[in-house]
Amino acid sequence: MSIVQNKKAFHDYFIEEKHEAGAVLEGWEVKAIRAGRAQLKEAYVIIRNGELFLIGCHVSPLLAASTHIQPDPVRTRKLLLHAEEIKRLIGKVERAGYTLVPLDIHYKKGRIKLEIGLAKGKKQHDKRESEKQKEWERDKQRLMRPK
């Protein structure tokens, strides 16, 4: 069940692989994400010292859940993956011109997980072509629908 989706990522990138990662979150962040108060629109994933970090994900704190601390809505959050997965992703990102983008935040067995995609950027004409293809699929469905 998806909590937050990054639709802009599918518009701006060709997603080639998807990976599920855990995230190191604080208590107030978990409560806010469960309430749907997170945004992935301008978020991205970087590699630092062989670890993955989520940058730019905005989590608006709940007033009731964050009274005793000073919450930082856009703090850097560490992502948790197996070491082999991280090594493979680092190799592709550094060598082949790929980037890592967050696709959505969802639950899995009661835990909050982040789906990241190994992606290649789209050019402007690729974006136009994708949009034309989507429109054609919608028109096809509309024409095939019984009246």
Curated annotation (Swiss-Prot):
Q: What is this protein called?
A: SsrA-binding protein
Species this protein is from: Nitrosospira multiformis (strain ATCC 25196 / NCIMB 11849 / C 71)
Q: Where in the cell is it found?
A: Cytoplasm
Q: Where does this protein have compositionally biased stretches of type Basic and acidic residues?
A: 126-147
List the disulfide bonds in this chain.
Answer: none
* GO MF, one example: RNA binding
Q: What is its main location?
A: cytoplasm
**Cellular component terms (Gene Ontology):** cytosol
Question: What does the UniProt keyword field contain?
Answer: Cytoplasm, RNA-binding
Which parts of this chain are annotated as the region Disordered? Answer: 119-147
Q: Which InterPro entries match?
A: SmpB (IPR023620), SsrA-bd_prot (IPR000037)
Q: Name one GO biological process term.
A: trans-translation
Q: Which family does it belong to?
A: Belongs to the SmpB family.
Q: Which domain of life is it from?
A: Bacteria
